[in-house]
Amino acid sequence: MASPSRQPPLGGSGLLRGSRARSYGSLVQSSCSPVRERRLEHQLEPGDTLAGLALKYGVTMEQIKRTNRLYTNDSIFLKKTLYIPILTEPRDLFNGLDSEEEENDGEEEVRPSKDEIGSSSGKRKNQGSASSQPKGTGLPPHQGTSTPSHDLSASDFLKKLDSQISLSKKAAAQKLRKGESGVPEEDTGLYPSSPRMQQRAVLGPVPLTRTSRTQTLRDQEDEIFKL
């Protein structure tokens, strides 16, 4: 018995399904729905280029070629005008039906979060407590002046750095002055260590004494110089 011929299932591939088989070099329509695509007519000018138009309108060169049915080697100046495909927003297609959702979104954006409400209430409490305190009783100096490093602005940080540098300079200058004033005292304490220096310090300068021998030597030298 001959096997019964198999019939192709309904909705199969090919022409029965309604889809067109792609071939090399064929022009295929865009996969985007034509309802979401809006075409803008551009009048060509001598300085226009395909890349420049793509950058100007925010589309790709392939989209412009596909919309105007241009091949790769074709020049854009074969036509007087080019159609630029621009995708429209999905909300524009509802014709105002989505206005309620937009209003709800706007209300959600306007409403503050719980964290913001808590922080604002905390600030108000701090301000109220500060105003309730008498003017005479202020915060201690270390609490009033000390602020966290991450809360300091750039100018405050630079001012703090300058003050620290000036304080370090003053401390270094004071140390130098103390060192200069202490040097002579140390020097004077070193000299009297030897007994001869101690004797000179006590008795004063030793007077010169001339003996007969020194006198004769001096006379002989004078005679030699005279000759």
Curated annotation (Swiss-Prot):
Q: Which SMART domains match?
A: LysM (SM00257)
Q: Residue positions of the PTM Phosphoserine?
A: S23, S33, S99, S166, S181, S194, S212
Q: Which Pfam families match?
A: LysM
Instruction: Return the annotated region ranges for Disordered.
Output: 95-157, 169-227
Q: Which SUPFAM superfamilies match?
A: LysM domain
Provide the LysM domain boundaries: 40-84
Q: Which protein, by its recorded name, is this?
A: LysM and putative peptidoglycan-binding domain-containing protein 1
Gene name of the encoded protein:
Lysmd1
